[in-house]
Design a protein with these regions (language model features):
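Bacterial N-terminal signal peptides that target proteins for export
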Residues: 2-17
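Short glycine/proline-rich, acidic loop/turn segments that cap or connect secondary-structure elements
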Residues: 11, 285-300, 348-356
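C-terminal segment of classical bacterial N-terminal signal peptides
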Residues: 18-30
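Proline-rich, low-complexity linker regions of envelope-associated factors in Gram-negative bacteria
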Residues: 28-33, 334-336
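Mature N-terminal segment immediately following signal peptide/propeptide cleavage
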Residues: 35-63
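A general alpha-helix detector
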Residues: 40-47, 111, 148, 354, ...
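Catalytic glycan-binding domains that act on GlcNAc-containing polysaccharides
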Residues: 53-284, 297-302, 306-326, 331-348, ...
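Short acidic, glycine/serine/threonine-rich helix-capping segments at coil-helix boundaries
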Residues: 346-351, 359-403
Length: 407
């Protein structure tokens, strides 16, 4: 797995749409785990020394550290609940993120002007990535990155990833790249406002303000660094990621997929049209058909810039969410074709009603604030299980119906 694929994995596991199994990942006792971890730390010094890490930095990095059981737990298990594309996009492209994205668009206008001029990456896409990765900096991760990566590195299926990124993180410390205090990030080692892994920090992070530091914990330098990353992956300046389209009856699943890419002029000749009826602006551009929920849901022709977004995270649903959130921040509307399963964003009134209904039924969710977080989703899963329906923890109008039907 190359460094770019590792970036995709590390950012993917950090997304809040996934819910992980709450099972113990320790196959041995904590004492045995600590002993094995300490042995790894001692033996890994040889690799760190070879990579140019000083003994002083190495000892400071590992002082007092033990393996992180939560990291082992998450690394050992795949997500228990996987949202279908419709629910993923609805959960990702929220009114709150759209409004906040537009506020950031105004707040950082001059900086975004300069970033877009230099790297050519659409500012709305950069803001969408920021919103998707850390909700505009509100949750950048509170894990000690050295502890997380060394925990991944000493055992488990991501040991190679953990060790390579651990060396990169130690190099960051050696170069004084980290703000005061421990290096903090996600459990998989992604850091800063736009969640770069250490190796990609070393390759792509930029010093935007010229102070001699590449500070991805600063919003502007994180946005500039992600712009540099996307530009180096082949971002096509001045072009979009794709189009929502209307399909003629004869074009269906047999035409979909990346291997069936063709020019927009050939798609038009087949009768595929943009929603709204406008012509495709560059008939020679190549695109492939993506049907996230089959022929009954929205259909998209995806261009090269969509593939570039996927260099950040390889999931189609992630890249579609980034593209759609970017369009909404720009002022665009939601998809015209409805999702076949009825997935849609809840109104504020509905969110409060779900929380109040769950409390009335005896579920513990914490404060009623209209934010459907971890506790609310856990309560929804219990409600779904009780009612014998698919358990995914996703808040929909059907949850309100379920609450109203219960005695």
């Amino acid at each position: 797995m190359n460094k770019l694929n590792l970036q995709r994995w590390a950012t993917g596991v950090a997304l809040s749409c996934s819910v992980f199994v709450a099972a113990s990942a320790f196959s041995s006792s904590p004492v045995q785990a600590n002993a094995a971890y300490e042995k790894f730390v001692r033996s890994f010094w040889a690799s760190a020394k070879k990579a140019g890490i000083s003994r002083k930095v190495y000892d400071e990095a590992f002082a007092g550290l033990t393996p992180d059981p939560e990291v082992l737990e998450k690394n050992a298990h795949q997500p228990e609940f996987k949202l279908p594309p419709s629910q993923y996009v609805v959960a990702a492209v929220t009114d709150t993120r759209i409004v906040t994205g537009r506020e950031m668009l105004e707040k950082y206008k001059s900086e975004l002007d300069a970033i877009e001029a230099k790297w050519g990456v659409d500012r709305h896409v950069l803001l969408a990535i920021w919103g998707m990765e850390t909700n505009f900096g509100t949750f950048m991760g509170k894990k000690n990155v050295i502890r997380s990566l060394s925990t991944l590195g000493y055992r488990g299926r991501r040991a190679k990833f953990g060790r390579s990124q651990l060396i990169a993180a130690l190099r960051m410390m050696e170069r004084g790249a980290v703000p005061d205090g421990p290096m903090l990030g996600s459990w998989a080692g992604a850091m800063g406002h736009t969640q770069l892994i250490p190796a990609n920090y070393l390759r792509f992070a930029v010093d935007y303000n010229g102070d001699g530091k590449r500070d991805i914990w600063s919003p502007v330098e994180a946005l500039a660094s992600s712009a540099n990353f996307l530009a180096k992956q082949g971002w096509d300046r001045g072009k979009t990621f794709g189009y929502e389209v209307k399909l003629p009856g004869r074009v269906g699943k047999g035409y979909s997929g990346r291997r069936r890419s063709r020019s927009l002029s050939k798609w038009a000749a087949l009768g595929v049209k943009r929603i709204g009826g406008d012509n495709f602006p560059r008939a020679g551009d190549r695109a492939y058909l993506y049907l996230p929920m089959g022929t009954k849901g929205p259909a998209f022709l995806l261009l090269d810039n969509f593939r570039t977004i996927m260099r950040y995270n390889a999931a189609h649903t992630y890249a579609l969410s980034v593209g759609h959130l970017a369009d909404r921040i720009r002022g665009g509307e939601t998809f015209v074709t409805p999702w076949p399963d009825g997935a849609r964003a809840l109104t504020e009134e509905e969110r409060f009603a779900i929380q109040n209904g769950l409390i009335a039924k005896g579920y513990e969710i914490g404060d009623v604030d209209g934010v459907l977080g971890t506790k609310t989703r856990a309560a929804i899963r219990k409600l779904q299980k009780k009612n014998g329906v698919k358990v995914d923890g996703f808040p929909t109008p059907k949850i309100l119906e379920m609450l109203s039907k219960e005695g």
